[in-house]
Amino acid sequence: MEKKKTAVPAFLGVAAVWIGSHFGPGFATGAFSVRWYVKYGWVGLVTPLLAMFVTGGVMYYMLEYAREHGTPGYRPFARSCYGEKLGGVVAVLYDVCFLMTMMCAGGLAFSGEGKLLQGFLGVNYWTTAIVTILVSAALCLYGSKLLAKSSGYMMYAIVGVVLLITVLALTRGDCDVTGAFANSAANAKDSSFLHAILGAMQYGCFQSTIVFNVMSVSDVLKDKREARKAILSGYVITIVLMVCLIFTLFSYTNVFDVCAETLPVMAVLNRLGMKWLQWLYVILMTLAVLTSAAGLAHAGNVRFDGLFQFIPNKQLRRFVITAILLGIAAFGAALGFQTMLQQGTSIVGWTAIPVIVIPAFTFVAAKVRRGA
């Protein structure tokens, strides 16, 4: 029988897990944009290409190895790729990286959404956290196919809303694109080109840690061609979203101090005076939280499922694992948004270089090329 066509092809569903995991509230709020790009001036419009080249390379090599060898979980991946003895050590290092990412990226997700909803609707932070945990757990109940498909649909919504915000902010607001470029050096918080390049590379390394989320749905891809399409699609869409938000914020740097705002995108939307657009942005943030949290939680389910076999019901087991992992994220959020944004992302990024990034571009890449 002919397979039923879907609005979300498998490769695009995998790409959506990457995009959704990346496009969490840290980026959706604009906080990542000003932290890693806008503060360097106009050069920050170009450096995302470098950052996502690093992330995309790691994604492709590790995703393709996981697909080819049937190891969506990073523990069996480590033992298959590095051997039984060394693989055991690498798996522990992966555990450390994953849990750090869960606390940092997940913490940013909860904290960013909590700040937005508390300021916009007066909703208590823990109410936001509990609802997010429950919905993310529901998305993880039925495995990789549901997660990839649901992430794909949410990705369509995210792309549409970001493009709409960009167009309206640039055409209906009081932005000053000409002034932003003309006074780029004066408005930049750091005008060093070298710092901008190093910052982009560090950001690319930090985002490489979400490779475990993408690997966890590798089983929905049928061949290497689909893996390549997934990563290429993820790269292009992520770059478009990043540049849209960065350019939107950059265009206001000559109007007010964008980089000083905790929620830069909302600060721009407030200047537009469009209440409906603010509501749409709140929906965007909620989708960003759910895709980011669900992607992290599913990767954790694939990894820790074996430790919870004492719970016989598979769906209940996934729910419990998700609740525990997102509870760790909620604890990270309690440390504060700025702490996670400044110190947390830097620590995770530096840790990822020797544990994930360098091995992916050398050892794992060589095995993928050889088909070993």
Model-derived segments and their meaning:
Residues 2-10, 39-44, 68-101, 119-125, ...:
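Transmembrane-helix boundary/entry motifs in multi-pass membrane transporters
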Residues 6-9, 35-63, 233-243, 344-357:
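Extracellular loop-to-transmembrane helix junctions
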Residues 7-28, 101-102, 169-174, 182-239, ...:
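Hydrophobic, membrane-embedded alpha-helices of multi-pass small-molecule transporters
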Residues 25, 136, 140, 157-187, ...:
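Hydrophobic alpha-helical segments and their helix-loop junctions in multi-pass secondary transporters
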Residues 109-119, 133-154, 220-223, 328-343:
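Membrane-water interface regions at transmembrane-helix termini and the short interhelical loops
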Residues 249-275:
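Membrane-interface interhelical connector segments
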